[in-house]
Amino acid sequence: MRTKPILALSTSWCSHRHRDGYVMLREMADLGYEYVELSHGIRITLVPGILKAVEEGVVKISSTHNFCPLPTGVVQAAPNLFEPSVTEHREHDQWLRHTKRSIDFAAQVKARVLVCHLGSVTFFWFDPARNIRNYLRDHHDAGRGGDDQAYQALLAKSLTRLRKRMRPFWEQTKASLNEIYDYASQKGITLGLENREKFNELPLDADYADFIMGQPPTAPIGYWHDTGHADIKEGMGLLNHRQHLAKNAPRLLGFHLHDVSATGSDHQGVGSGHIDFKMVSEFWRPEHLLTLELSPRMTLDDVKISKARVEALM
């Protein structure tokens, strides 16, 4: 029985500069990682080397990220290429096809979890996300304190508009998930439903816990917490990071760990920004998967320091 969570490194940091999946995973193993997450930038050409490395035991795969591998002809990360919230049947069919393919691949590499995005609400005119973005660009800290009354009024108005439009998108997302539950269960894969960073992405953070807890106990799903995304949403005034984690703790599967800089850039090295990782670590459990999801811009030292800082909190 494990006494500490698994700590993995995501290929988000390095897949772009590799042509051979074996060499990529060998590099990650040489940094001291027993486990790796195969992220949403895995090109088809990397797959043979990945399978060889997994078969030889170079690393183990803790999780993968939809879509993995990428659809044929797509050569860069594209997790929102097809969305489960879209009602147009051709895109829906593509989402379903490539999600099932990702489930197959996750099972093939013996991953436990496939991390998934749940779509978004689209606006043809008067997108409320634009008003939020513009205000925060000029008043960077307006969302954190709750003291900016003009921003609070804008936020309330924008949320009302978002909720008014979101129903068909959210209903489609739930229907899409229902289409893959049995398939994922048959393959032994749990779907990690990830919190997102954009204003109009689904589900709304305030609804996440009720949605997941309201699913059938047999549904192969759980909550996947991204620290950077939660911090960005906290900066918008949409959640309190600790309270959000506490509400979703009963169905937590794992974490994407990365920091956010003073200018709002995420996927930074752990401890380099303002996220309270000591607070986050209070929610870690031995059965959880912890994944460092770092930007390709991070240096080798950034990766090593992030690993050491997480291990010190475990």
Task: Briefly describe each language-model feature range.
Residues 34-40, 192-194, 291-293:
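Short catalytic-loop micro-motif centered on adjacent basic/acidic residues
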Residues 36, 81, 159, 166, ...:
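Residues at structural and domain junctions
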Residues 67, 196-197, 228, 295:
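Catalytic metal-binding/acid-base residues of hydrolase active sites
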Residues 61-63, 193, 225, 292:
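Hydrophobic residues in well-ordered beta-strands that form the structural core
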Residues 1-7, 11-29, 44, 55, ...:
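Histidine-acidic metal/acid-base catalytic patches
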Residues 84-222:
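Active-site acidic/histidine proton-transfer and metal-coordination neighborhood
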Residues 1-111, 130-150, 168-170, 178, ...:
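N-terminal pre-domain/capping segments
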